[in-house]
């Protein structure tokens, strides 16, 4: 295990000495495990004013040079370290009034060929003493040989596409279209065929919460079951297709997916890209959250 304090100081020293934002910095970040990288991202030094923007540079420098993809729910997919750098760093500087606050503990999932991490967060627009809550989101990253090969940030962009008080609409692109690679190791699931009763027996009777970005929070098994019964009944022709492996570490599980509307004639219509998270107490599900972009849904 490396000394993360030493690693972060090496990186920050080199970062401050670089010639410009496009320069790759490797000091302190070579040969790290996914757990060590996660500790780097969470290091308090990155929150200090003198190191502003170092965190996003760190993430870019840890992307695999060529075989990497970063996905943002508004701007879509970028490929390769330098293309990701060319977009992400200027964008984060442009929106540096937005803070990302963790909402749940991060998690690590170790497999034979790769490692994945999970972060759940909420955005806040900060203007002086005012903190305006923005959508919650989730980041899922894949690591191979000390580099990030895939990073996907999923959140609901629908509210960001609505007219403001003055009637103006944010200058952002339409909902991105990505040809997601399906993970056939996870069976497709027809949402309308969900056995809600069986599913909900897995939730803690009282100390459980289910969170939907559009419909809100439901607390306790009975409330969760009542809402899911109604909600899922309206999704008879919707199929959930995995676009990532089923990840679990015993306490937390993650599944990345896309919803497809499959008509009786076989016609397929993309609905939304999402990520589901569940956390347990060892016996019951105590926390479940679905993250997806409602802006891509037909009724949005």
Protein language model regions, located:
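C-terminal and inter-domain tail/linker signature
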Residues: 1-300
């Amino acid at each position: 295990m490396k000394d993360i304090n030493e690693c972060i100081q090496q990186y920050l020293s080199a970062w401050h000495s670089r010639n410009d934002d496009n320069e790759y910095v490797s000091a302190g970040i070579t040969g790290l495990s996914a757990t060590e990288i996660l500790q780097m991202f969470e290091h308090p030094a990155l929150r200090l004013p003198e190191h502003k923007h170092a965190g996003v540079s760190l993430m870019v420098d840890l992307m695999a040079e060529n075989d990497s993809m970063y996905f943002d729910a508004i701007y879509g997919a970028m490929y390769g370290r330098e293309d990701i750098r060319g977009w992400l760093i200027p964008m984060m500087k442009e929106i540096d009034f937005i803070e990302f606050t963790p909402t749940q503990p991060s998690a690590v999932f170790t497999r034979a060929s790769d490692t994945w991490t999970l972060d759940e967060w909420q955005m806040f627009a900060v203007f002086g003493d005012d903190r305006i809550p923005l959508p919650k989101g989730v980041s899922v990253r894949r690591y191979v040989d000390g580099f990030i090969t895939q990073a996907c940030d999923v959140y609901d962009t629908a509210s960001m596409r609505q007219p403001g008080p003055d009637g103006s609409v944010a200058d952002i692109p339409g909902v991105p279209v990505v040809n997601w690679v399906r993970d056939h190791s996870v069976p497709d699931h027809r949402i309308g065929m969900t056995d809600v009763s069986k599913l909900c027996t897995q939730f803690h009777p009282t100390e459980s919460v289910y969170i939907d970005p559009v419909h809100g929070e439901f607390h306790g098994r009975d409330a969760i079951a009542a809402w899911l019964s109604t909600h899922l009944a309206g999704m008879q022709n919707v199929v959930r297709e995995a676009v990532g492996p089923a990840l679990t570490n015993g306490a937390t599980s993650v599944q990345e997916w896309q919803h497809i509307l499959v008509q009786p004639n076989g016609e397929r219509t993309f609905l939304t890209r999402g990520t589901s998270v569940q956390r347990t107490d060892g016996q019951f599900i105590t926390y479940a959250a679905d993250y997806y972009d409602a802006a891509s849904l037909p009724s949005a």
